[in-house]
Curated annotation (Swiss-Prot):
Keywords: Cytoplasm, Histidine metabolism, Hydrolase, Iron, Metal-binding, Zinc. It comes from Shewanella putrefaciens (strain CN-32 / ATCC BAA-453). The keyword Lipid metabolism does not apply. Pfam families: Amidohydro_1. This is Imidazolonepropionase. N-formimidoyl-L-glutamate binds at Y145, N320, G322. Fe(3+) binds at H73, H75, H243, D318. GO terms for biological process: L-histidine catabolic process to glutamate and formamide; L-histidine catabolic process to glutamate and formate.
């Protein structure tokens, strides 16, 4: 056989639903790569003969290979920090209190409007490096810290540039409807007009976004405004997603499901009717335990109902300066289990196959299947559950991206 590389002495957590074992596991396995794709995988005993003198062979020393991790919800590009708000919350102020007083997202908006692209790029590069060291091979990055046309475009341009200069694939999301900017505080409908009539066409003209998101909440955009933005995005051929049911149940998830959204994110206050709507539309539920933890929330997402209705559950970092300043997907695995009572297998599925579904890329990444992109990680672990069980020492030993060894 003619391959570009072969990995032996490994166990595979394929996350392939067609493999009946937990995690889609194949033990005592091998995996071969050709032209950036998975060319063969299976038990080592069935590995076809190949020229060991001309093909690089990597020995995994009994470790586990998983698909590359996918962080499907981040706000990774921003300037400044909000440590002062952290102190205020510890003194009793709520997320809503801070937002209504002009803090929260708006304070980061000010910093991003003042920062240039070079500064934002370097900050984003450092954060993307941190995720990459934990085995992330694909990341979603949202805008939303500009809230004017110029700065929203600036953030999205930086995200696109990061994707061009980093081995991690970057999917971009336009989140102009993240908050009401101060200049539109008393006229939010006019800001929605600006998003639809000026921002969105400019984003599309430069091909800066793969999807459009809205923060549907009582401190942000109401249902009617949310539908206007998402409908305009859908009409323009972009994928849609939604921040919903984080602080209250406004029915945003049902709206998103009706419009065919790829995902609904946060969903702490999602009810059974909303879960049923997600199930019927095939919309993913993105769980963000970092924000739940950092905001010291008590209302948990309806995990049992999501299981009952078969809604794909995704885990993501929600990395951002205000509600989840936690740049770690491995910690999300642990939090998903300890805070939301996911099983370790559900948690890992949420950072691989289901995360790919939330981004609409499950045909190319998210599981180890012949023909899919060769994005995978070798972990120094005895069992896949160990990724969620223990945190603090990074067990990621090697990362292969598009068939190339990028971290060793």
């Amino acid at each position: 056989m003619s391959w570009d590389q072969v990995w032996i002495d490994v166990n595979l957590a394929t996350m392939d639903p067609s493999v009946s074992a937990p995690y889609g596991a194949i033990t005592n396995a091998a995996i071969a790569v050709k032209d950036g794709k998975i060319a063969w995988l299976g038990p080592r005993s069935e590995l076809p003969a190949f020229d060991v003198l001309s093909i690089p062979v990597y020995r995994g020393k009994g470790g586990w290979i998983t698909p590359g991790l996918i962080d499907a919800h981040t706000h990774l590009i921003f300037a400044g920090n909000r440590a002062n708000e952290f102190e205020l919350r510890l003194q009793g102020a709520s997320y809503e209190d801070i937002a209504r007083a002009g803090g929260g997202i708006i304070s980061t908006v000010k910093a991003c409007r003042e920062a240039d692209e070079a500064e934002l790029f370097e900050l984003g590069r450092q954060r993307l490096n941190a995720l990459a060291k934990e085995g992330v091979t694909t990341v979603e990055i949202k805008s939303g810290y500009g809230l004017d046309t110029e700065t929203e475009l600036k953030i999205l341009r930086v995200a696109r540039e990061l994707g061009k200069h980093h081995h991690v694939d970057v999917k971009t999301t336009f989140l102009g409807a993240h908050a009401i900017p101060p200049e539109y505080k008393d006229n939010s409908d006019s800001y929605v007009d600006l998003i639809i009539n000026k921002m969105l066409p400019a984003v599309i003209a430069e091909n800066l976004a793969d999807a459009v998101d809205v923060f549907c909440e009582n401190i942000a955009f109401n249902l009617e405004q949310t539908e206007r933005v998402l409908s305009a995005a859908k009409a323009a051929g972009l994928e849609i997603k939604l921040h919903a049911e984080q602080l209250t149940n406004m029915g945003g998830s049902a709206l998103a499901a009706r419009l065919g959204a790829k995902s609904v994110d946060h969903i702490e206050y999602l009810d059974e009717a909303g879960v049923k709507a997600l199930s019927e539309s095939g919309t993913c539920a993105v769980l963000l335990p970092g924000a739940f933890y950092f905001l010291r929330e008590t209302q948990k997402p309806p995990i049992d109902l999501l299981r009952q209705y078969g809604v794909p559950m995704v885990l993501a970092s929600d990395f951002n300066p205000g509600s989840s300043p936690i740049c770690s997907t491995l910690l999300m695995l642990n939090m998903g289990c300890t805070l939301f009572r996911l099983t370790p297998e559900e948690a890992l599925t949420g950072l691989t196959l289901n995360a790919a579904k939330a981004l609409g890329i499950e045909d190319t990444v998210g599981s180890l299947v012949v023909g899919k992109q060769a994005d995978f990680c070798l972990w120094d672990i005895a069992t896949p559950a160990q990724l969620a069980y223990s945190y603090g020492v990074n067990p990621c030993k090697d990362v292969v991206k598009n068939g190339k060894l990028v971290h060793q």
